[in-house]
């Protein structure tokens, strides 16, 4: 394919994408395929000779689309949103065309410098403390990770390296292996599974702190866990607080947990993967109160801020905590500006070496929507979630399980777990809408997350009518 054909095919692909998204609600939101459906439709080996672009495009509808879960359908209410917008798609095209691997400033100065500026832009939108911003001479700063899972792992490994060095400086006879055996990290029993995975990868004992009646980690429970482990000779060093848990969008109490972490010299990492986007709205910024106690903070613009995957924003107060843990400097990566003190080499801030020009997506989206446009988008989703909450509350057969704060509603039929499992199975089998469950205090609960960029009140109303009708069917069957 030369540039001439690329111009033609590129325009055709833009038309295909626009048609796909314009007509997405006409497709079943969940695919009607069985595991292994695709292999028989594709040859066992790659073609020896080139195939035509026309044949490939035909196979998209024939082979790929039947197995796609349409995350951007206005009838997709599962998990949490995954962001999508036309400005971000255009930026991704440009990113692919430039194709730089921005592991250092010298590898592509614009890639590095735009990321630094965009992370400062976003930090200011969130009203983060100055300590988290790079500015012109700041000690902190932001970096784009691939996911919140990566950000948590990076924070844990940095905290681990830091505490090991501190302990060995005080007691040189204390070996790394001996220290590792005693290190312990903490998070709420409502935290995302990626926190547990970070502990596994980092070789760290991770303990779940019981949450309160609102599924929030509080001071008393954390203090009790810390004191118990210190008495047993263990070394607490890392706490993950969650703002907007995956199960029910609950919030750990930063104003209680933060001071304890600071008093104990424990690294506090905040995971706000979903909820963080909402903090650009003044009315939701209170949910971030206490961030000043944190050592690192992370959320995913690729969830709810119209920046397509992947784009996970992470800030640290002390960049040397990251560079001290991940600095590898072989001669083939060195460059003449790296010791100037004026530039950032992001390879020292992350697990992999290579990195894409992801900040282009942020730049396009922030400029083409503006802060006010992004705030309006968040507010619309929150309004729709409260609309759904109101519909549920009007039906005495159902109950709301947690406070609705942002774009997630947790609800269930009054009755057994089996009844609700049956309802969810009916909902997803019908393929008109898509939901996923959670379990709260041993109760099977349905989650309704407002996700799509194009979702409107009419979609929420139709979704509720569908759920209500299926609930009637399930309840009739139970009586019979």
Swiss-Prot record:
The modification N-acetylmethionine is found at residue 1. One of its GO terms (cellular component) is cytoplasm. It catalyses: L-dopa + H(+) = dopamine + CO2; 5-hydroxy-L-tryptophan + H(+) = serotonin + CO2. Sequence repeats lie at residues 58-115, 118-178. Substrate binds at residues 82, 192. Homodimer. This is Aromatic-L-amino-acid decarboxylase. The gene is Ddc.
């Amino acid at each position: 394919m030369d540039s001439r054909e690329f111009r033609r095919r590129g325009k055709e692909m833009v038309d295909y994408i626009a048609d796909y998204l314009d007509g997405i609600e006409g497709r079943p939101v969940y695919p009607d395929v069985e595991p292994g459906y695709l292999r028989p439709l594709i040859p066992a080996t790659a073609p020896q000779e080139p195939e035509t672009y026309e044949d490939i495009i035909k196979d998209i509808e024939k082979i790929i689309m039947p197995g796609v879960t349409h995350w951007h359908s206005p009838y997709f209410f599962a998990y949490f949103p995954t962001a999508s917008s036309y400005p971000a798609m255009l930026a991704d095209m440009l990113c692919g065309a430039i194709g730089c691997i921005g592991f250092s400033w010298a590898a592509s100065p614009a890639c590095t410098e735009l990321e630094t500026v965009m992370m400062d832009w976003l930090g200011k939108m969130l009203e983060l403390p100055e300590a988290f911003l790079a500015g012109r001479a700041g000690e902190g700063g932001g970096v784009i990770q691939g996911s919140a899972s990566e950000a948590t792992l990076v924070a844990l490994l940095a905290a681990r390296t830091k505490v090991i060095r501190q302990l060995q400086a005080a007691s040189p006879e204390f070996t790394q292996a001996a220290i590792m055996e005693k290190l312990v990290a903490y998070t709420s029993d409502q935290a995302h599974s990626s926190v547990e995975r970070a502990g596994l990868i980092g070789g760290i004992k991770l303990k779940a702190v019981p949450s309160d009646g609102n599924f929030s980690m509080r001071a008393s429970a954390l203090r009790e866990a810390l004191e118990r482990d210190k008495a047993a000779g263990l070394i607490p060093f890392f706490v993950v607080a969650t703002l907007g848990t995956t199960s029910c969008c609950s919030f750990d109490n930063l104003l209680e947990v933060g001071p304890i972490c600071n008093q104990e010299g424990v690294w506090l990492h905040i995971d706000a993967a979903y909820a963080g986007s909402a903090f650009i709205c003044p009315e939701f910024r209170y949910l971030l109160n206490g961030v000043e106690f944190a050592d690192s903070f992370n959320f995913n613009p690729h969830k709810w801020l119209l920046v397509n995957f992947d784009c996970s924003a992470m800030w640290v107060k002390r960049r040397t905590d990251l560079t001290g843990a991940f600095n590898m400097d072989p001669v083939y990566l060195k460059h003449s500006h790296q010791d100037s003190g004026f530039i950032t080499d992001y390879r020292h801030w992350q697990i992999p070496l290579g990195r894409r020009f992801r900040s282009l997506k942020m730049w396009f989206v922030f400029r083409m929507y503006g802060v006010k446009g992004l705030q309006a988008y968040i507010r619309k989703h929150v309004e729709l979630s409260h609309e759904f909450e109101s519909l549920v509350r009007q039906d005495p057969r159902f109950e709301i399980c947690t406070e609705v704060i942002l774009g997630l509603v947790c609800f269930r039929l009054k009755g057994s777990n089996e009844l609700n499992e049956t309802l969810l199975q009916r909902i997803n089998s019908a393929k008109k809408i898509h939901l996923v469950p959670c379990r709260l205090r041993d109760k099977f609960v349905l989650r309704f997350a407002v996700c799509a960029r194009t979702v409107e009140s009419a979609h929420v109303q139709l979704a509720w009518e569908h759920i209500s009708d299926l609930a009637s069917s399930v309840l009739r069957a139970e009586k019979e």
